[in-house]
């Protein structure tokens, strides 16, 4: 499956998740990471239409400022958890997990440091790895999942229904 097809499949699955969240009156947020930084493009909201539009227009490819994405995600979730301590926080990260942009110096260490804070905060994390199958594995998604207890899936393993089932199982466990 080519990179564009993999990302389109992931976007389709997330759109299904957005619709499910809307029906349950859950809130969604979106952080995009590309070029040299991550940015909050959708603060937590119930607007599925806005989330769907932003997701469809989201470009793929280029650099992967993964450390900044995890840092920003932690900050956004931390604020939301402080405002609403009874929420069940679920973070879904879709990436090839090949960090290549540092916030300061060591991008891999920065990713692990941010993930440690996320795990300590009790945020449920689902990693969806878009790195193509090959003998040479560069991405660190599986290592992140193993180290911090995050759920990990290759994009090829997932369907829209599978992602919804994963999120529903997290909600039931709390």
Curated annotation (Swiss-Prot):
Cited SUPFAM superfamilies: vWA-like
InterPro entries tied to this protein: Mg-chelatase_DI-like, VWF_A, vWFA_dom_sf
Pfam short name (any one): VWA_2
SMART domains: VWA
Disulfide bridge positions per record: none
Entry superkingdom: Archaea
Protein name: Uncharacterized protein MJ0910
Native source organism of the sequence: Methanocaldococcus jannaschii (strain ATCC 43067 / DSM 2661 / JAL-1 / JCM 10045 / NBRC 100440) (Methanococcus jannaschii)
């Amino acid at each position: 499956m080519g990179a564009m097809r993999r990302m389109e499949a992931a976007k389709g699955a997330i759109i299904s998740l957005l619709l499910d969240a809307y029906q349950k009156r859950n809130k969604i947020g979106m952080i995009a990471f590309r070029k040299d930084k991550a940015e909050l493009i959708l603060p937590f909201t119930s607007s599925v239409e806005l989330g769907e539009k932003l997701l469809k227009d989201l470009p793929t490819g280029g650099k992967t400022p993964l450390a900044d994405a995890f840092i920003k995600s932690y900050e956004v979730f931390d604020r939301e958890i402080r405002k609403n301590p009874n929420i069940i926080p679920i973070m879904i990260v879709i990436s090839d997990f090949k960090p290549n942009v540092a916030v300061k110096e060591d991008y891999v260490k920065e990713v692990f440091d941010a993930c440690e804070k996320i795990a300590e905060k009790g945020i449920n994390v689902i990693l969806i790895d878009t790195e193509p199958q090959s003998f040479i594995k560069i991405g660190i998604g599986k290592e992140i999942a193993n180290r911090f207890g995050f759920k990990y899936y290759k994009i090829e393993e997932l369907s829209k229904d599978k992602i919804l089932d994963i999120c529903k199982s997290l909600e039931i466990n709390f």
